[in-house]
């Protein structure tokens, strides 16, 4: 039925649509080898991008009758030149769309790009904190601002207004040179410069501290003079022996005293300057304390109670051996020297009180000395071994692992 209808329409000069066979064909698609009307051509070639690229030919309308009769009856005018081709064109012509570019770019885009570049460069720049440069820039900005119109800041007379015609209305918003100078002076004083270096000691509150230090030095000098005078007087008298309390205290408990002194110094620093001066005075008084023994008064009070010597024989006292060393030592040599002097004088301190106390003290000191010495040797050996041991990234490494790594 469709073929007969198409052949019936094809018998005329016009060609029917191959798709709907109802309307006259207006387009010929070589890729599809089909004659299509307007509606069918639009629906077929809008289906996908591949169909849109098909090349189509616009068919002309039927010519006059004379031209129709001049042509051969078996061949139509529209069929001349058309041959059957492949459904997909091989290397067909492509429609090149002309894209026009502005040869001269707009000025606004260039300015915007340059401004962005300048901003990116300024981000990585170090600001120049120079007072001279800032002042110069400030003066230049003031000169540029003078070009703006005038606005009076307050109600003035006509003469004053004439004098101020050269100033800008924006000058009131910026500080003057006097204000800038005052600001720089304040900044210098805050930073430690300027006139701050010439403040007197009394203004800073250090006068009282200096006075206290001077008084302490004078008191120390007086105490040392008194001690020297007393030592000289003791040397001249044959029967007076002065035992320095500080010396005995330091020889027996030297290490304990050092710890106590450190604690005392820490407490003194926290208490303040006034309490520190009072503590120093008390320490000087303790140093001035001395133990004296007058043999004449002892013998007179002893009377006829018997011989005062425990050995029943008076010991020979060598006055040259009575003097004690002025320096204090925490070593065992000074302690032994101190006890040897007492034994030479016949004064046995351990026998007067507890008989075994002296032996216990000596054993304790010997044990402490050997323990400290052994600990020191042990730590030194560990330190040397640690320095010789191989390390890798700050940690000890076994020698076997080093050989494997190499």
UniProtKB/Swiss-Prot annotation:
Composition bias, Basic residues: 82-95
UniProt keyword Nucleus, yes or no: yes
Protein's UniProt name: Zinc finger protein CONSTANS-LIKE 6
Binding positions (Zn(2+)): 17, 20, 40, 45
SMART domains for the chain: BBOX (SM00336)
Keywords for this protein: Metal-binding, Nucleus, Zinc, Zinc-finger
Positions of B box-type zinc fingers: 17-59
């Amino acid at each position: 039925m469709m073929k007969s209808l198409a052949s019936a329409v094809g018998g005329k000069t016009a060609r029917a649509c191959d798709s709907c066979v109802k309307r006259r064909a207006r387009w010929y698609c070589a890729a599809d080898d089909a004659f299509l009307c307007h509606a069918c051509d639009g629906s077929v070639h809008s289906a996908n991008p591949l169909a849109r690229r098909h090349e189509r030919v616009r068919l002309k309308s039927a010519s006059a009758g004379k031209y129709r009769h001049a042509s051969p009856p078996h061949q139509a005018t529209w069929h001349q030149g058309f041959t059957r081709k492949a459904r997909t064109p091989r290397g067909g012509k492509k429609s090149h769309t002309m894209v026009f570019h502005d040869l001269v770019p707009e000025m606004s885009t260039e300015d915007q790009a340059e401004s962005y570049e300048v901003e990116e460069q300024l981000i990585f720049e170090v600001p120049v904190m120079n007072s001279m440069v800032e002042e110069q820039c400030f003066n230049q900005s003031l000169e540029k601002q003078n070009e703006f119109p005038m606005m009076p800041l307050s109600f003035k007379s006509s003469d004053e207004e004439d004098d101020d015609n050269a100033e800008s209305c924006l000058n009131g918003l910026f500080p003057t040179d006097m204000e800038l100078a005052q600001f720089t002076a304040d900044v210098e004083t805050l930073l430690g410069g300027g006139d701050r270096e010439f403040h007197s000691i009394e203004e800073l509150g250090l006068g009282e501290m200096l006075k206290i230090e001077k008084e302490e030095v004078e008191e120390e000098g007086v105490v040392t003079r008194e001690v020297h005078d007393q030592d000289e007087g003791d040397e001249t008298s044959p029967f007076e022996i002065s035992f320095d309390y500080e010396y005995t205290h330091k020889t027996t408990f030297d290490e304990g005293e050092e710890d106590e002194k450190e604690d005392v110094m820490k407490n003194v620093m926290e208490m303040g300057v006034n309490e520190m001066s009072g503590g120093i005075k008390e320490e000087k008084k303790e140093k001035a304390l001395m133990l004296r023994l007058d043999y004449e008064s002892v013998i007179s009070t002893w009377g006829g109670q018997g011989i005062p010597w425990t050995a029943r024989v008076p010991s020979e006292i060598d006055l040259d051996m009575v003097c004690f060393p002025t320096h204090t030592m925490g070593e065992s040599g000074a302690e032994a020297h101190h006890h040897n002097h007492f034994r030479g004088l016949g004064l046995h301190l351990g026998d007067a009180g507890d008989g075994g106390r002296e032996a216990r003290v000596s054993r304790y000191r010997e044990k402490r000395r050997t323990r400290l010495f052994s600990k020191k040797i042990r730590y030194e050996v560990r330190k040397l071994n640690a320095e010789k041991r191989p390390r890798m990234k700050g940690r000890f490494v076994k020698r076997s692992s080093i050989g494997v790594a190499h």
